[in-house]
């Protein structure tokens, strides 16, 4: 990604920071969350609780209109400016954040009271526990990926590759999960950046299977057989923030989300991902704990995609998928019906701190659905099928990456709107609380910005069986300026403008594919396919005499099975026709065979055989 000159970036930062920093409403004391108050009621004086302290000076990422990289610098500046504003119990280990101007620490009830009374503190919350969206089904580890992920064709990803040559190349996709096994053959060379927030290990790993499976659906290749990744040309920015069992602290998720915005720690480099796939959830639908994170991602140009959850039934979507700023993804089976486990909307907000919607506001969810049942993808040691909205979310995230490659200047709002507008509407007409806008259609989304591919028309094809090495296809096609071909799944030829395409084929059976190519390089992903057999030997006929019901019968056999004979193909010189001819007074002197291409072969019958 490009870089902004340092002097220009500083100027942009100064301007943006001047209008972006604001103070949260003042009060006699900070708001202590209901969950924290409940825990404090049963906490001894010498015990400590994990809390997140949010300070009043904040950068409003949701209203930020400056340069994206300037947002990172402004967020960092706000955090540094308030670094000494928190009352601590002497030397104390704290984690400071800049994504939201906040601090996490373990604090005693007395310290929490002092912090809440500080005029620079806006709120004190109990650190929330999150977990990976549990898989509903998981197969044993397999030695190959078989036919691959059925979802790739279901959402039109393969058509995007074939028609537009778009595979996600140049796009980075973020994933916050249990880690990734970078040694899986489908993920080798796919990791662009890595950070372990759980154990601090330098090299990528996955002590579960969840993260590696998600990663495979995002960018996996086809080393195990069939293709498993929707955007195989993209790379991954991976943050391990969940344990191998899929559990994690909210503060670790904030740290991972913050790192996603600036993996190399240099605001002048735009190394953040274009979309982040999240298959984890916090149980409370209207918990605004992660709202600043999602808003900051969007302000930076990152599409936030979240699994809806696997609880099933109405009103069961957790946060952050429940936010209007998030793309919540439900799961469908291969017959395009909603899975029983897929969490549904609507979400009714009971927000009391003013950070979310007004109490009683109803938000429709999910936003989209995607394949999430028996999805084949990578795991440590091989491949496996899994089911869950965790498997559906990466289909949508990778589709967003394909769309971003097709239209790099699209905003987050435009990407999401395009994915919804081009989705395959399922269930009741229009958006609903089971399927959202429908099943994501990557091909329709890309087509909407790049135009429809050309079509390949066939005026005349060569015969199925020919006796020459040269064959000619007479072609036409709507929107076509040229045509390309390949033989037996080899390399595609360079496009040629002529509508008469002559190919050289070796002897034998061949699969010939021809595609129309538009002036802008877009190709017809379907094209035409024909089987052509070259056999220059021609048919070989053998005749033998048998006795049938006391009569002498001559039977002709064709030795070369490559030739398919026309009906009534045996032509007896005596005028009789058929596969078997009964000798009468005068037996034929020869037999002629004609094949579907019109080629003939004649075999004389010895007089001794005819007697």
Predicted region positions:
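Inhibitory N-terminal propeptides of secreted protease zymogens
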Residues: 28-136
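Subtilisin-like serine protease catalytic core
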Residues: 31, 46, 64, 148, ...
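C-terminal subdomain of the subtilisin-like protease fold in secreted/lumenal serine endopeptidases
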Residues: 38, 149, 228, 270-277, ...
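Protease zymogen maturation seam
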Residues: 70, 118-172, 185-186, 283, ...
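Substrate-binding/specificity loop regions of serine endopeptidase catalytic domains
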Residues: 204, 280-302, 307-362, 374-393
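Short, small-residue alpha-helix embedded
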Residues: 218, 391-408
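Short acidic, glycine-rich surface-loop motifs adjacent to enzyme active sites
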Residues: 260-287, 307-308
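Low-complexity, disordered linker/stalk regions enriched in Pro/Thr/Ser/Gly
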Residues: 450-611
């Amino acid at each position: 990604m490009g870089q902004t000159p340092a002097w220009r970036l500083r100027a942009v930062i100064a301007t943006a920071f001047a209008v972006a920093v604001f103070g949260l409403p003042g009060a006699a004391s900070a708001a202590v969350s209901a969950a924290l108050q409940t825990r404090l009621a049963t906490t001894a004086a010498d015990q400590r609780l994990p809390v997140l302290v949010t300070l009043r000076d904040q950068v409003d990422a949701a209203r930020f209109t400056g340069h994206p990289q300037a947002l990172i610098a402004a967020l960092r500046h706000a955090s540094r400016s308030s670094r000494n504003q928190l009352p601590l119990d002497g030397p104390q280990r704290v984690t400071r954040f800049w994504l939201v101007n906040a601090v996490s620490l373990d604090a005693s009830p007395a310290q929490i009271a002092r912090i809440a009374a500080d005029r620079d503190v806006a709120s004190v919350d109990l650190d929330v526990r999150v977990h990976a969206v549990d898989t509903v089904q998981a197969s044993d580890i397999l030695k190959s990926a078989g036919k691959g992920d059925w979802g790739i064709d279901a959402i039109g990803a393969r058509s995007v590759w074939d028609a537009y040559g778009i595979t996600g190349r140049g796009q980075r996709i973020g994933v916050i999960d249990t880690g990734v096994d970078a040694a899986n053959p489908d993920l080798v060379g796919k990791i662009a950046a890595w950070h372990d927030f759980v154990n601090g290990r330098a090299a990528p790993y996955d002590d579960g299977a969840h993260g590696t499976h998600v990663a495979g659906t995002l960018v996996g290749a086809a080393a195990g057989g069939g293709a498993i990744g929707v955007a195989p040309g993209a790379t991954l920015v991976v943050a391990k923030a969940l344990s191998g069992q899929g559990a994690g602290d909210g503060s670790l998720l904030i740290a991972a989300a913050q790192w996603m915005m600036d993996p190399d720690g240099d605001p002048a480099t735009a190394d953040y991902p274009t979309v982040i796939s999240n298959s984890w959830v916090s149980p409370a639908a209207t918990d605004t704990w992660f709202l600043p994170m999602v808003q900051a991602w969007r302000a930076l140009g990152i599409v936030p995609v979240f699994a809806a959850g696997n609880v099933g039934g109405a009103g069961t979507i957790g946060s952050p998928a429940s936010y209007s700023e998030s793309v919540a993804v439900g799961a469908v089976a291969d017959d395009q019906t909603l899975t029983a486990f897929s969490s549904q909307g609507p979400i009714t907000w009971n927000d009391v701190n003013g950070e979310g919607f007004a109490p009683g506001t109803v938000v429709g969810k999910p936003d989209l659905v995607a394949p999430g049942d028996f999805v084949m993808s990578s795991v440590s040691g091989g491949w496996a099928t899994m089911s869950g909205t965790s498997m559906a979310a990466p289909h949508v995230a990778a589709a967003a990456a394909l769309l971003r490659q097709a239209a790099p200047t699209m905003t987050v709002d435009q990407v999401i709107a395009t994915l919804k507008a081009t989705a395959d509407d399922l269930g009741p007409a229009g958006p609903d609380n089971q399927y959202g806008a429908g099943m994501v259609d990557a091909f329709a989304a890309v087509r909407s910005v790049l135009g429809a591919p050309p079509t390949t028309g066939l005026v005349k094809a060569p015969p199925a069986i020919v006796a020459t090495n040269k064959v000619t296809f007479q072609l036409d096609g709507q929107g076509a300026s040229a045509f390309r071909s390949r033989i037996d799944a080899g390399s595609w030829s360079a496009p040629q403008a002529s509508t008469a395409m002559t190919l050289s084929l070796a002897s034998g059976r061949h699969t010939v594919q021809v595609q129309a190519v538009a002036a802008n390089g877009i190709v017809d992903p379907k094209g035409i396919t024909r089987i052509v057999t070259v056999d220059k030997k021609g048919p070989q006929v053998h005749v033998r005499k048998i006795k049938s019901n006391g009569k002498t019968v001559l039977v002709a056999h064709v030795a070369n099975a490559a030739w398919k004979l026309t009906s009534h193909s045996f032509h007896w010189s005596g005028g009789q026709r058929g596969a078997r001819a009964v000798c009468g007074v005068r037996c034929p002197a020869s037999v002629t065979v004609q094949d579907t291409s019109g080629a003939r072969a004649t075999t004389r019958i010895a007089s001794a055989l005819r007697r």
